[in-house]
Amino acid sequence: MANYLRWTVGQAQALFEKPLLDLLFEAQQIHRQHFDPRQVQVSTLLSIKTGACPEDCKYCPQSSRYKTGLESERLMQVEQVLESAKKAKAAGSTRFCMGAAWKNPHERDMPYLEKMVEGVKAMGMETCMTLGTLDKQQAHRLADAGLDYYNHNLDTSPEFYGSIITTRSYQERLDTLSEVRDAGIKVCSGGIVGLGETVRDRAGLLVQLANLPKPPESVPINMLVKVKGTPLENNDDVDAFEFIRTIAVARIMMPTSYVRLSAGREQMNEQTQAMCFMAGANSIFYGCKLLTTPNPEEDKDLQLFRKLGLNPQQTATQHGDRAQQQVLTEQLLHSDSLPEDSVQFYNAAH
């Protein structure tokens, strides 16, 4: 295994304190050493089981503990999920992420989850799931089905974590990431900016991620979307430059990871998103109308790509093909009509 730089919170905090333009310059230099700066990986997210989650994550409208008006739904049928995946591929996404609002999957659900992974893989798309805590057997079963990525965010620093979540320990999250990695599945893990954390907490989160035995292949950075009925509905807005700093520091600390703009993009203007790409972000959730939090519509994403000279990255899976790249290229040139989104699309990053 490659040797990765071990970071301290002090070192990470020093990056946050750099003059912004110096920080962006360093992040962009590092980004160009490892990635094509014009390529952006695009994913679509689907809620396969919505609401009624027993967890108490203070930011999440899917928790059964808060009255947010969200209607809970049972686990979707495999056929419904695959139909949504077809629409996502037709719209140009190269990775299909499936999220379920529960603490952990039950044994009765595993055969359906495996079929979902197998079906999406057969379409030539990368697969990702976020299902909560996994044990060793579950991780290996999903790996055998062909799962490419597993998302399980750390959310914030270990020190601040207990102020946001009490129903799942920080160590439990780290243990799940370890089981996923040991099963041969790529790790997707990041956090949220705007929970009420300090800059030191942001530094602490990124240190936890960067100092994993191997840094996550994908690091989603979310901006808190304040939902009425959740305990954080009245939190202060996140300063755009502070969010951009977080993207830049993540890029510097994890040079080979994809850094994803996740929840909260609807709150960002084009200039903020452009600076995030400049800071090293190179992945987005594309064209999904998120179930519990809004996300820019497909045509807006495509128009922004065109303005910035960005290109959607082609996937490389066992069953991959060039059709996805061609579809996106055509849409960038002629973004007049796009497939309808399912109302099931949402941000399941947590």
From Swiss-Prot:
SMART domains: BATS, Elp3. Binds 1 [4Fe-4S] cluster. The cluster is coordinated with 3 cysteines and an exchangeable S-adenosyl-L-methionine. Binds 1 [2Fe-2S] cluster. The cluster is coordinated with 3 cysteines and 1 arginine. One of its GO terms (biological process) is biotin biosynthetic process. Pfam families: BATS (PF06968), Radical_SAM (PF04055). The keyword RNA-binding does not apply. Its EC number is 2.8.1.6. It is an enzyme of class 2 (transferase). One of its GO terms (molecular function) is 4 iron, 4 sulfur cluster binding. Catalyzes the conversion of dethiobiotin (DTB) to biotin by the insertion of a sulfur atom into dethiobiotin via a radical-based mechanism. Homodimer. HAMAP family: BioB. Belongs to the radical SAM superfamily. Biotin synthase family. This is Biotin synthase. The gene is bioB.
